[in-house]
Structures are given as structure tokens and as C-alpha cells.
Amino acid sequence: GDVYKRQDFGDEAGYTPLLPMFTLGHNFAPAHIHAGGLRYHGAGVIVSQLLKDNLMEAVDIQQLESFEAGCLFAQSEGIIPAPESSHAIAAAIREANKCKETGEEKIILFNLSGHGLIDMASYDKYLAGDLVNYALTDDDIQKNLDEIGDLAK
């Protein structure tokens, strides 16, 4: 919700202008996950505005579900997606499964933002069973936000 909506720096060092965004705090140190560009501390400014205006919704996709979706996509489409794209694929699969259960017909669109050829080691780790899911608690998030305070003051 809006509890996480605030202004924050776009970089860890705090050199950028303050940006309106949904953020975990520019001092956020993520777990060692294999999600490439998803290690960023906040949603981009445009995405944050779309979320605020209820024109889109954000969903949480754990990395194991993401890699499972990426493997399915690679097997069915012949394209190895980047881990970032695999999160979008997993969300599209979830939505398609909901439609299958309810009988609703929808056009489901996702963005394949890149290939995963640079990140094959992550797929190897997934296939070997060496990856685990990781989730932040609300307490972890609040602690991080308390550390940065209200930067807009």
C-alpha cells in the first residue's frame, strides 16, 4: 500500500535527486538472489505512478517460481528468458491459470525484456536445486524505511 510510497534516491549513494517511488530504501541490501536487475531498491518512477493510480498492480514472484516459468517458456518457445523476464512470465502463467479455472477469457500481455544467455549459471543452479526462495518480513522493510526516514523534509 501507500505505506511504502515515499521519495527516495535512485542510487545507493544518494547522489540522484529525490524521486517519488515505492521503495525499500536506497540503503536496502538484498539477499543473494539470482534475479539480475531485480536487485534494485524501488519501483521505477513511471511504474510507481502507474501503481499509485491503480493502472497496474504489482505481484510478488519468488525466484523458484520464476525460474520454473523461465524453463517452461524456454521449452515451449525456444527462448531462454532473462531472470527478470521470468518473473513476468510467471505472473502471466498465474493469470492464465486463473482464467483457466474461472473460464474467463483475457488477453494477457507481458514484457520479455531480455534473453538469459548471460545468466546460464543461475539456470544451472536452479536445475541443480541450489536456489531457495527468500522473503523480506514487514519488520525488515519497516526497519529499512525507518533508517532512511522522510527524505522529502
Q: Locations of the language-model features?
A:
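Short, small-residue-biased leader/transition segments that mark boundaries at the very start
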Residues: 3-4
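Hydrophobic alpha-helical scaffolding
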Residues: 8, 24, 28, 36-37, ...
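Non-catalytic terminal extensions of PLP-dependent enzymes
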Residues: 13-49, 66, 71, 126-153
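Short, flexible coil/turn micro-motifs enriched in small/turn-prone residues
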Residues: 20, 73, 109-111
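Active-site-adjacent helical/loop segments in soluble small-molecule enzymes
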Residues: 41-101
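Catalytic phosphate/nucleotide-handling subdomain of diverse soluble enzymes
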Residues: 91-151
